[in-house]
Amino acid sequence: IPVMVPGAPSAWAELSEKFGRLTLEKVMEPAVTYAREGYPVSPVISKIWNNAYKEFIDTLKDESFKPWFDTFARDGHAPQPGEIWKSEAHAKTLEKIAKTHAKAFYQGELGDQIDAYSRKTGGYLRKSDLENYWCEWVKPIHVNYRGYDICEIPPNGDGIIALMALNILKGYSFTDRSCVDTVHKQLEAMKLAPAVIDGSVRMSFSAENE
């Protein structure tokens, strides 16, 4: 399955650089500690985790998924409520991201490992994809819906779909949020908006970035 370049590490680095008073290493210390020393899994998370495990054990048979089970279901099951879950590999990864301001993830050792595993398992993600990526600072787009300014991230994000759907719905009056007519109009707006986006906005965005 093709995957996109993960953007979170670069976002952590950018947010820390622009707004933080502490180093990224200091900010990520608690996450590293939880990963290394472990934390008790809550009942809600345990249930969600177990549901995912039950689904994955029946569907993810390929050898490429074995590391997932080795990491998140070491004893052949999802962690039980109150069980201490830890991952030294996660701790080391977070430390490398923090120490290099995320450069290790996109341009260094972690990027090499991602590339190697992707090639080994028939994936498409390459280190060149990682090297060519860094998060962007963008101006939000917005609409005014019944007196409220609703802001979203512009394309290539999907927030514009929600804004367009709200613009469609501005032309209608609603009295009961649970009535069939209200739900029907909301569903139709959410069906129409993506069709318009796919047919015009995405094509325009792609052309501008070729």
List the model feature ranges, each with a label.
Residues 1-210:
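Feature marks proteins synthesized as precursors that undergo proteolytic processing into two chains
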